Amino acid sequence: MPRRRGTPLPTILLLLAFVGGACGTEILSKSRLESCSHDSDAGGRLKCDRKLVVDLAVPSGASGGEASLVARVAGVEEENDTPSATKSIRDPPVITVSKSATYALYALTYLDRDVAYRPDEKYVKTHKCEPYAGAKVVGECERLWDEKGNVIKQTEPICCPCGPHRVQSKCGDIWSKLTKGKANTAHCVRFPGDWFHVFGIGAWSLRFSIRVQVKKGSSVWDVVVGPENKTVVSGDNFLRVKVVGDYTGYTSIPSFEDNYLVTPRKGTGSSQPQDLGNEHSKWMILDRVRFTLDGLECDKIGVGYEAYRNQPNFCSAPYGSCLGNQLWNFWEYDKRRIDNSQLPLYIVEGRFQRINQHPNAGAHTFSVGVTEDLNTNLLIELMADDIEYVYQRSPAKIIDIRVPTFEALSQVGIANVTTKNIGKLESSYSLTFKCSSGISPVEEQLYTMKPDEVIARSFELRSTTDQAAMHQCEAILKASDFSELDREGYRFSTAATVYNNGAQIGPTNDHKKGGFWDSIKALWRNLIDFLTGRLCWTKCPRLFDFGCHIQYVCIGWILLLLLIPAAVVFLWLLHQEGLFDPLYDWWGLEPDDDYRARRRHQKGRHHRHHHDHRHRHGHSHGDHHHHYHGGHHQRRRHHHPPAWDVEGHHHDRQQHSHEAGRNHHRGYGEVVAAGAAPLRLDRASRPGQTEVDAVVEYRERRSRHERHGGHGHRDGHYSPSV
């Protein structure tokens, strides 16, 4: 296995694997091997003949946050080779770069001045108010003394007459004036509650730190660089890192040179604060013009006793004059903005990110996070005297490809390709996974395999459509000289994207609100859609797909399939009962006469039996009217008497009616006996006449009867009809 050490190599290729928050890391230029004699003395020199130079663009994380990346030197190219070939490094160095969050640092200057959060005017209604009066007369507006017992100037009360002046007060009657003196009011300003430190803010400076770790074999080197320490060399002179600078200037870093920072006072007294604390919700940055550091201006932060006492027209001015535009006014204004989901104008919290999170934060510095995403140019130099390269070529093959089905767009698929070195030498290989369409291109992978070694490499697959599809791909394995060793095709499918609104159920467009009847109509439409199966048409397009119908409860399809045979059976039963005979007569469709005759003969026997039973029932009651009613009921129920029974039955009923008329005077019992005479049925009017002939003769007789007005045999008591 031939090797070469320290060969002049003009170009180094890097294989980058990104981790952490890095999202846009890139190689600025192809890294190179240079002579160490070119080094300057700035920051120290490397002890080597050759060095590997890597030029990187290190980005910031999201909103200027932390970021990290891993760069692995995978192979080299020699321009003198024809054709150009990439050779792998046996023990490639791995470079890990971690960049901290970027922030702007400001120097703070304490102004030896604390200000009250909310100055408050006090007043007392009294009599005989004087600037030097005691507490019995002016109450809490009595003048103040310092720790040494000296009167604090300008703390005396201001006396205003009674009446409609600064404070409305009654002057009292004459007796009160004589006994107590003239009524008046005493006014003063006091500073209760919280106090705040005031700081001047200097110019900003950019701060971040970049930690570079190089691992080669079992050895690890670490250095940390930043804007304040741009070049650092490791202790054994193996590694040197330099911050070249940022490619573009920052535009969103605020300048506070015309502002003051106020923070709540910690402890007592107004001496130099040692700790700013972390109550960022009370920190405010305000314009300098809003402050009066000597206390001589009204309506400014820091107003003092003198400005309050010496304001013009004091007694005629409104109550609380000279005490406007204080810290509490700005804080409450911002609080209302925050409650209305607006950004504050003065409060630090919510206006900036990563407040005072810089290392070694104290009372002399203040920092805010920088949200711009800018790249930092980083130059890394490694000693390259002992780098070894692998040149041999060995055959290999692809032994397995697996791609589990995944959901398009919402999921990332994994293609696992397993390769094996089937040769006798250790060699480097390149592997790629290419798909015809629908899958985004993937990056080629470089790696080394020993003889008979099996290695599985993974590729992330991302679909470019949300539809289910079948994809045709190929895994291509190449040798160290980039000649193709093996190629295997593979087909896999992706499932369609399932869209889910989560807790936000429903479409994004607004629906028009309807009234009560609109709700009823919508409910009715949904019911019709459910019963008719309209909702299932898209899921079960085939009529006889019973499994699908049951799965999606397609009641419309199921009922339709069940109603078809039920309707056929029902129509056949109606046909058996003769319900369609009038239709047959109307359309001229005559069923088999023998069949109809037999069916009507059976019905006729049933009717005669029922008629005889009704007659016997009338005799048992012995009531002629019951008999008549029974006959009438029989006529009403039997609209279609049998053809062979009509003539004989009609004749018997006429005879029965005449006999009943003649014997009516004989008595009740005789009438019943006459009515109980059995009816005779003439099946054939003439010898040799068949039942079918009797039917035809009956129809002709009935037709003549209807042409003559439909009059039958009648008497005074009973008129039977056919």
UniProtKB/Swiss-Prot annotation:
Stretches that traverse the bilayer: 553-573
Membrane topology: Single-pass membrane protein; Single-pass type I membrane protein
Signal peptide annotation: 1-24
Cell membrane as UniProt keyword: yes
Location of region: Disordered: 598-665, 680-722
Composition-biased stretches (Basic and acidic residues): 646-662, 712-722
Compartments in which it is found: Endoplasmic reticulum membrane; Cell membrane
GO MF annotation list: lipid binding
Major localization class: endoplasmic reticulum
Chain intervals with Basic residues compositional bias: 598-641, 701-711
Residue spans, topological domain Extracellular: 25-552
Disulfide bridge partners, by residue number: 36-48, 129-159, 141-188, 160-315, 162-171, 298-322, 435-473
GO CC annotation, single: endoplasmic reticulum membrane
Additional notes on this entry: HAP2/GCS1 family members mediate membrane fusion between gametes in a broad range of eukaryotes, ranging from algae and higher plants to protozoans and cnidaria, suggesting they are derived from an ancestral gamete fusogen. They function similar to viral fusogens, by inserting part of their extracellular domain into the lipid bilayer of an adjoining cell.
Domain notes from UniProt: The C-terminal domain (583-705) can replace the homologous domain in the Arabidopsis protein, while the N-terminal domain cannot.
Role summary: Required for male fertility. Plays a role in pollen tube guidance and successful gamete attachment. Essential for the fusion of gametes during double fertilization, where one male gamete fuses with the egg to produce a zygote, and another male gamete fuses with the central cell to produce the endosperm. Mediates the fusion of cell membranes. Not required for pollen tube outgrowth.
Name recorded for this polypeptide: Protein HAPLESS 2-A
Species of provenance: Oryza sativa subsp. japonica
